[in-house]
Amino acid sequence: MSASNSGENPYTHVQFDTSVGTFVVELYYRHAPRTCCNMAALAESGYYDGTIFHRIIRDFMVQGGDPTGTGRGGESIYGGKFADEITRNLKHTGAGIVSMANSGPNTNGSQFFVTLKSTPFLDGKHTIFGRIYSGMGVVQRMGMTPTDDEDRPRSPITIHQARPFRGPPPPKPQQGAAALGAGQAHARITAS
């Protein structure tokens, strides 16, 4: 299996090249190691390649990771579903938080979502396992995509390729001062 599951240094980020641009997810191994290993291994295997963001709710979140594109599919590297890794130290405090989509407790598979604003009502219900490191503008554009009455994008947004990587990420693109605070947030980590 990949180094992400063999005890070596885990992958630290996953880069998603989509039909509307590229974004990079920083993985929170310290808080959600099994969830991070799941995403990294799925990305490394090409599982996400060619899938779509099947659910977009403006001013809330964008959701993908289902190979069926229906919102009902997807499996983990662990064979089916796996348990939540919810910690009270991580909160959905703003745009750019990456969490597992689920259909109830301990039903994580391959689907994930990225928040477009603070969503505290999700705290304790969804495993937070990362944040958008770069490309939040791409995610925000995704969030503005017109959708039908079932929150499906009218024009598909496709993941062309998702690949994990280790070590220092590539430099962030230069941004103007106005863009630096444009809704991007870190998951708040509090001492327990």
Per-range role (PLM):
Residues M1-S192:
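Cyclophilin-like peptidyl-prolyl cis-trans isomerases
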